[in-house]
């Protein structure tokens, strides 16, 4: 499997700052994309892309850095930078899940350390989301009856109890159960339970995600 190159997004309304940051980030071996506003970033951001972090200016024309953070929710790690930051803004940013809040000007070493921490978190998030997407694709292969069987099986029902609940022959339930195990790529009941729980978690995440 080809490793996905992490991306560093930079949102800052100062063109000189964007250029300087992009140059530093590229020279340090990272991929980088820059944006002059939060609105431009939202238009182009793909939440289903590879692992990435966001280097975000607090004070922006139009949508502010904190407002953008609120819209992105848990989609990617955010490093705030500000020359006008105050304690209240820093607290709000960290409560919102920011990985760092850096005052401008920031030294190269401090910034790059913050980027690496954020990207490490991004890699974990990407791996987690990739796993959930794989599990969801398995669930989609199940027929409606197989999903019913899986729901009851992971709830602890025996085959004869599932048969009684669904009004089917126990032999038929055994066939459905075997197909569920095969399609979900589960080697044991315990693994099927784990997969079902993650599939449910993925559905809940999709339902509550704040990014649009």
What residues fall within each predicted segment?
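Basic, Lys/Arg-enriched C-terminal extension of HTH/homeodomain DNA-binding domains
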Residues: 181-212
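Acidic, metal-coordinating helix/loop segments flanking the phosphotransfer/catalytic sites
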Residues: 2, 34-53
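Acidic catalytic/metal-coordinating carboxylates
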Residues: 36-37, 61-70, 85
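Recognition helix of helix-turn-helix DNA-binding domains
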Residues: 158-191
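Conserved acidic segment of CheY-like receiver
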Residues: 4-17, 21-25, 38, 54, ...
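Active-site residues of response regulator receiver
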Residues: 57, 82
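C-terminal output helix
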Residues: 86-89, 102-115, 161, 165
């Amino acid at each position: 499997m080809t490793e996905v190159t992490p991306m560093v997004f930079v949102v800052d309304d100062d063109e000189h700052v964007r250029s300087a940051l992009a140059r530093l980030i590229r020279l340090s071996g990272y991929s980088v994309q820059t944006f002059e506003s939060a609105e431009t970033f939202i238009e182009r951001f793909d939440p289903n892309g590879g692992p990435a972090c966001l280097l975000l200016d607090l004070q922006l024309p139009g949508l502010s850095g904190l407002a953008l953070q609120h819209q992105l929710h848990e989609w990617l790690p955010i490093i705030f930078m500000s020359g006008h930051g105050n304690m209240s803004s820093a607290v709000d940013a960290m409560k919102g899940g920011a990985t760092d809040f850096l005052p401008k000007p920031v030294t190269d070493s401090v910034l790059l350390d913050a980027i690496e921490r954020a990207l490490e978190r991004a890699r974990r998030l990407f791996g987690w989301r990739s796993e959930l997407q794989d599990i969801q694709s398995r669930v989609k292969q199940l027929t409606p009856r197989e999903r019913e069987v899986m729901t009851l099986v992971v709830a602890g029902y025996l085959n004869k109890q599932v048969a009684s609940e669904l009004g089917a022959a126990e032999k038929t339930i055994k066939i459905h159960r075997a197909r569920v195990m095969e399609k979900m790529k589960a080697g044991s009941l315990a693994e099927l339970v784990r997969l079902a729980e993650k599939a449910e978690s993925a559905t809940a995440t999709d339902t509550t995600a704040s990014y649009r």
